[in-house]
Amino acid sequence: MGKEKTHINIVVIGHVDSGKSTTTGHLIYKCGGIDKRTIEKFEKEAAEMGKGSFKYAWVLDKLKAERERGITIDISLWKFETSKYYVTIIDAPGHRDFIKNMITGTSQADCAVLIVAAGVGEFEAGISKNGQTREHALLAYTLGVKQLIVGVNKMDSTEPPYSQKRYEEIVKEVSTYIKKIGYNPDTVAFVPISGWNGDNMLEPSANMPWFKGWKVTRKDGNASGTTLLEALDCILPPTRPTDKPLRLPLQDVYKIGGIGTVPVGRVETGVLKPGMVVTFAPVNVTTEVKSVEMHHEALSEALPGDNVGFNVKNVSVKDVRRGNVAGDSKNDPPMEAAGFTAQVIILNHPGQISAGYAPVPDCHTAHIACKFAELKEKIDRRSGKKLEDGPKFLKSGDAAIVDMVPGKPMCVESFSDYPPLGRFAVRDMRQTVAVGVIKAVDKKAAGAGKVTKSAQKAQKAK
């Protein structure tokens, strides 16, 4: 095997008909984890249904359908390789819960790939005031996805086909537009592609001799290339937060005969090791970690991104639950939040939101009603500048600083300290009505919580 490639996560955004599925399908198809047999099966089905021209998107549709039905499909299907990276597509919009997934998401995307369609009239539709493209790009930026690649797709359907003029016009528009959101266009690779025909996807296109390649300038090193695959190869690798204190939000807690209580979750920051004494917030239970395992193999340490189960002593299944957060009892242990201040963006709420609104935000794995206790100020959503003090209400499109109070004990952190525990989505009326980033947390000084015997022993021994 040699040295493993670095894993990176991307999120693909863009308007409904921009050709996201075809483009993504093409990459997975050509560089991915789908075996020949599956592809032949898909091609045959697509042809039988008269969808021959749709085979790449068909791949993605099949995968999506399985995802929606909750079949845990072979996740390798959502992966592909570049020369430097293993790339996982963590989500593509169009999926009902896209926005929620992007926020509570199993992982933070390292880069967003924005697909815009170059076809006559298509680009204009996708980027119009109420186009989803704006929303998705703004979300990506707000949630800390600071790298962006733009694929100008369907170059084969411009007037005339492969028109340089049309491409340049679009690059100009998109640059203005992403700049308003906060991205610096100089750091963004723009690539003219056809996800369907394969132009500039993996190989330079003979149809666009005028395209001299893309260039990005950034302080961590400049890069240039011709294809979309090369642009993905030039993503700056993420630094995984191993140096921060441990934070592990629980997804489930199992009781396993002969072993005992096994909380399961994903290490978001820090390192989890057997022998560590961990504290669970907000329940304030402290105990020793006996063992840590992933895919049924014992680990000597679990790092950020690892989904693990760990065995804890003298703790019953009733003591800890989904939404609790485990941390190192000696290094900034997690605590209950009495309240928190957040910057929220209202996405689509039919009415007005005023103080007292109490929706149920999804923050990491917690799902607890929180009251908008005070609307402190309305702000400009790009610059963050204050527009108005103490607004009476908020409506769609507004950004604001609000004080929130959880209805039941919960543990959250500020976005700057622990990003995955500091962003949330507010779902209401079957849609995401707002997203938020936590600015500050009012932590409740914990009283004497439950400290198990094994934790006391482990602490004495040290």
From Swiss-Prot:
Its EC number is 3.6.5.-. Translation elongation factor that catalyzes the GTP-dependent binding of aminoacyl-tRNA (aa-tRNA) to the A-site of ribosomes during the elongation phase of protein synthesis. Base pairing between the mRNA codon and the aa-tRNA anticodon promotes GTP hydrolysis, releasing the aa-tRNA from EEF1A1 and allowing its accommodation into the ribosome. The growing protein chain is subsequently transferred from the P-site peptidyl tRNA to the A-site aa-tRNA, extending it by one amino acid through ribosome-catalyzed peptide bond formation. It catalyses: GTP + H2O = GDP + phosphate + H(+). Residues 70-74 are annotated as: G2. The modification 5-glutamyl glycerylphosphorylethanolamine is found at residues 301, 374. The keyword Cytoplasm applies. The modification Phosphothreonine is found at residue 432. It is found in: Cytoplasm; Nucleus; Nucleus, Nucleolus; Cell membrane. One of its GO terms (molecular function) is GTPase activity. ISGylated. Found in a nuclear export complex with XPO5, EEF1A1, Ran and aminoacylated tRNA. Interacts with PARP1 and TXK. Interacts with KARS1. May interact with ERGIC2. Interacts with IFIT1 (via TPR repeats 4-7). Interacts with DLC1, facilitating distribution to the membrane periphery and ruffles upon growth factor stimulation. Interacts with ZPR1; the interaction occurs in a epidermal growth factor (EGF)-dependent manner. Interacts with PPP1R16B. Interacts with SPHK1 and SPHK2; both interactions increase SPHK1 and SPHK2 kinase activity. Interacts with guanyl-nucleotide exchange factor EEF1B2. Residues 14-21 are annotated as: G1. PANTHER family: TRANSLATION FACTOR. The modification N6-succinyllysine is found at residue 392. It comes from Equus caballus. PROSITE patterns: G_TR_1 (PS00301), G_TR_2 (PS51722). The lineage of its organism: Eukaryota, Metazoa, Chordata, Craniata, Vertebrata. This is Elongation factor 1-alpha 1. GTP binds at residues 14-21, 153-156, 194-196. Residues 5-242 form the tr-type G domain. Belongs to the TRAFAC class translation factor GTPase superfamily. Classic translation factor GTPase family. EF-Tu/EF-1A subfamily. GO terms for cellular component: cytoplasm; nucleolus; nucleus; plasma membrane. The modification N6,N6,N6-trimethyllysine is found at residues 36, 79, 165, 318.
